[in-house]
Amino acid sequence: MQIENLQLGNIYSNEEIRSTFGCSLQSGMNKSNSTNTLVLIINHIKSIYHDRWFNNKVHHIGKGQIGDQELTRENKTLSESKSNGVVPHLFEVFKTGEYIYRGQVHLYDKPYQKQQPDKNGDSRLVWVFPLKFNNNSRPINHSEIENVFKTQFKKSQKLSNEELESKANNLPDILGYREVATIRHQRNPYVVSYTLRR
């Protein structure tokens, strides 16, 4: 399959993406030198990152799970994508093994740094990339957002009070908003779970 044949909103497998772009999906940012692209994956099931959506814009967290993130490798590639000729493409995962193609994105503002917990729960600096779709991305299904919330809420029930309080305090109450049938705020499952225990 050619990159230009990808359809917005369609579901693709890991193998289809790998063969189309010429890169492996080892992380949330995957560079392909053969197609001069950067494949960005927002995995709502497994990721430790907390990307924030604002309709057709997303503030995407950079690569690096432990300690302060550095502006090197794929992070550098994305930060210089306005001038280096690399084209970023974004996929979302709501179910394991299913990658929904959202389209090409570009930086609409300068990357910035903020505090966010790492894989071990320690506070660290991450790079945030303000991205906007080159086209009008399709609204997502309401059920996809609800399924993610339910999955994260279920996981939050297994955390200790201390872990839950930490997660609730380290994230905003509202994680962003997405267009579904109407604009819907994404709730923070850790705040909800922590509030129910009080």
Regions found by a protein language model. Give the residues of each.
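Charged, low-complexity, helix/coiled-coil-prone segments
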Residues: 2, 14-26, 135-142, 182-197
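Acidic, glycine-rich low-complexity segments with interspersed aromatic residues
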Residues: 2-99
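A short, terminal or domain-edge coil/loop segment
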Residues: 6-9, 15-18, 143-155
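Phosphate-binding glycine-rich loops and adjacent basic patches that engage nucleotide phosphates
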Residues: 36-42, 151-160
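Short, surface-exposed, polar/charged, turn-prone segments marking secondary-structure boundaries
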Residues: 60, 66-71, 117-119, 132-136, ...
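Conserved beta-strand residues within beta-sheet cores
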Residues: 87, 102-104, 192
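Compact mixed alphabeta submodule
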Residues: 94-154
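Short, charged surface segments at domain edges that flank catalytic/cofactor-binding sites
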Residues: 155-198
